[in-house]
Design a protein with these regions (language model features):
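Conserved phosphate/ATP/ADP-binding segment of small-molecule kinases
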Residues: 123-192
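Conserved N-terminal subdomain of the carbohydrate kinase-like
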Residues: 2-110, 114-122
Length: 192
């Protein structure tokens, strides 16, 4: 029997001092009547943007054990949402969750958390950017910001890109995914 309350596996970090990640996702999903089921990637003292000396507890190994348990239970989710990843191995776990725990007809959403304002998040590496390009192929919907669009397409960060360039980038991404890009639309509006 199908659970009448929609369930979403939320694969993200838990930041102690922040208004982001699981701290935001759980109450937002809950307020929408969705059962948020966290699969934490890391525990951080603060969010990564704006703080240089944050602490990070990597939960890569725990993610594997949690997924093993969920699979033994036969859990299925109406949606799988992934955000901040602390390692490339975590991206493998996120793909595994999409592949093995997403109910037929469910929605896979990947927020490719890589950077902002033209800079990588301090914990990100070129290898993680390359792996994120692979992870987004598992998604139905991706939610990159402008910096992440540039990183995913291996294009130089150019906040002054002209309208034809921005449209071309969006077309390249939109061949495979639905992409709500508020930051890009604001940049495009400035060009109109």
């Amino acid at each position: 029997m199908r659970n009448p309350i929609p369930r979403v596996a939320a694969i993200h970090d838990l930041a102690g001092f922040a208004r982001t990640s699981l701290t935001a996702a759980i109450p937002i999903l809950s307020s929408m009547g969705i059962q948020a089921t966290p699969l934490p990637t890391a525990i951080l003292s603060t969010q990564t943007v704006g703080y240089n000396d944050f602490t990070l507890l990597d939960l890569t190994d725990d993610m594997v054990r949690i997924l093993d348990h969920w699979e033994r239970l036969g859990l299925r989710f109406d949606g799988v949402y992934s955000g901040f990843m602390a390692s490339t191995a975590q991206m493998d776990s996120a793909a595994r969750c999409i592949r093995n725990c997403l109910a037929p007809g469910g929605l896979a959403v990947v927020d490719p958390v890589l950077g902002d304002d033209g800079k990588l998040i301090p914990t990100m590496t070129p290898e993680m950017v390359a792996k994120m390009r692979w992870l987004i192929t598992c998604a139905d919907l991706i939610t990159p910001n402008f910096t992440e669009v540039c990183l995913l397409l291996d294009e130089p960060y150019s906040p002054e890109a002209d309208l034809p360039t921005l449209k071309g980038w969006l077309r390249r991404l939109a061949r495979q995914w639905y992409i709500p890009l508020p930051g890009v639309f604001h940049a495009m509006q400035r060009k109109l």
